[in-house]
């Protein structure tokens, strides 16, 4: 499995001959113009995880890609043209297994209505398992080898992020 960080929350996962893009948001531009994607996954509707201005062009340029997103993102961003994914759903992209987990975005402020968030466990056969939680800090699946952890101010407190990373117990954290 090859994992390329494209900026902020966006990563490109290449595994078992498949190319899977996660969270093409507006704080990273390296994903724009990518082609030959087999899947595009979005954890939630915030623009730093799915760029509403440019996502349509990415989807159009990858017309054969499976596009899945948390339900709120599907409804709020029509250009995403995604099918909703919920915790417990399993996708098979070639030999790559993807399981949606979580369901709740980390609390931003007690006065703000909570939104949905799905994290993704991405694995190739019996090999490496990557966990991309989006902005979920409660779901701590076991058996994770690589954690793509949200660790960015001003949205996440470093104490919360470190506690979360330790609780997942992945061999590698990035």
Kindly give the residue locations of the regions a language model identified.
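Proline-aspartate-enriched helix->loop->beta-strand connector
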Residues: 64, 158-174
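Active-site metal-binding motif and surrounding structural segment of the metallo-beta-lactamase
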Residues: 26-69, 144-148
């Amino acid at each position: 499995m090859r994992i390329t960080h494209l900026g902020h929350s966006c990563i490109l996962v290449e595994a078992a001959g498949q190319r899977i893009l996660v969270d093409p948001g507006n704080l990273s531009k390296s994903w724009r113009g990518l082609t030959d994607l087999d899947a595009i996954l979005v954890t939630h509707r915030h623009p730093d995880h799915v760029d509403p201005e440019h996502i349509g062009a990415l989807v159009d340029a990858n017309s054969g890609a499976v596009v899945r997103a948390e339900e709120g993102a599907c409804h709020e961003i029509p250009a995403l043209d995604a099918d909703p994914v919920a915790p417990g759903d399993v996708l098979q992209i070639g030999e790559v297994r993807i399981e949606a987990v979580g369901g709740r975005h980390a609390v931003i402020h007690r006065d703000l209505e909570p939104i949905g968030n799905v994290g993704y466990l991405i694995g190739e056969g019996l090999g490496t398992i990557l966990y991309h939680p989006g902005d979920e800090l409660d779901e701590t699946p076991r058996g994770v080898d690589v954690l793509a952890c949200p660790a960015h101010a001003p949205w996440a407190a470093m104490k919360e992020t470190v506690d979360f990373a330790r609780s997942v117990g992945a061999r590698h954290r990035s």
